[in-house]
């Protein structure tokens, strides 16, 4: 069972109303963080999708609000954001490496709180491969419940609702904090 460990502190206790982050900016931020620190670090398309999902899911679970504009569908290989899928679809396959050259914005500007939150999630999930993150998501209630009675290999484009993420990751966060 994987969940961020304690240590985020009061970062998100402040409820500040700001403009919603773009999913493309968060995508570019993750690419830049991973590849700037180690340009040989693996960041395949599958892994990027799962990292984006966990940033959004934990934001809902901890803060009860989204980190960025965007939703995730319960696809065969785990949660996928269709907009980011479409962004890379013409040049990248599921297991294709994503590189700094794939960034749309090399100067992403996020609030310090949002950057710290994303870094916190990356600290906890970057150590896993795309396949491991896929398996993790397949064992979690939001993906399972969204797919319902579908076989694991059946196509699905149902959206994983914010309510499911708030419920599941919120409970996990309360367990971590206690």
Where do the protein language model's features map onto the residues?
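Single conserved hydrophobic/aromatic residue that forms the stacking wall/gate
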Residues: 1-15
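Domain-edge interaction signal
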Residues: 14-178
């Amino acid at each position: 069972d994987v969940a961020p460990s304690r240590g985020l502190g009061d970062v998100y206790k402040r409820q500040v109303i700001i403009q919603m982050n773009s999913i493309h900016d968060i995508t570019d931020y993750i690419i830049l963080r991973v590849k700037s620190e180690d340009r040989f670090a693996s960041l395949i398309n599958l892994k990027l999708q799962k990292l984006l999902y966990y940033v959004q899911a934990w934001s809902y679970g901890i803060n009860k609000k989204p980190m960025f504009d965007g939703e995730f569908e319960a696809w065969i290989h785990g949660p996928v954001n269709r907009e980011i899928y479409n962004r890379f679809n013409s040049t990248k396959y599921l297991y294709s490496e994503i590189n700094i050259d794939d960034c749309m914005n090399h100067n992403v500007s996020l609030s310090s709180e949002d950057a710290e939150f994303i870094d916190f999630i990356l600290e906890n999930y970057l150590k896993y491969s795309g396949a491991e993150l896929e398996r993790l998501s397949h064992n979690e209630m939001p993906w399972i419940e969204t797919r319902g009675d579908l076989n694991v290999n059946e196509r699905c484009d149902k959206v994983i609702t914010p309510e499911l993420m708030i419920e599941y990751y919120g409970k996990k966060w309360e367990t971590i904090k206690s």
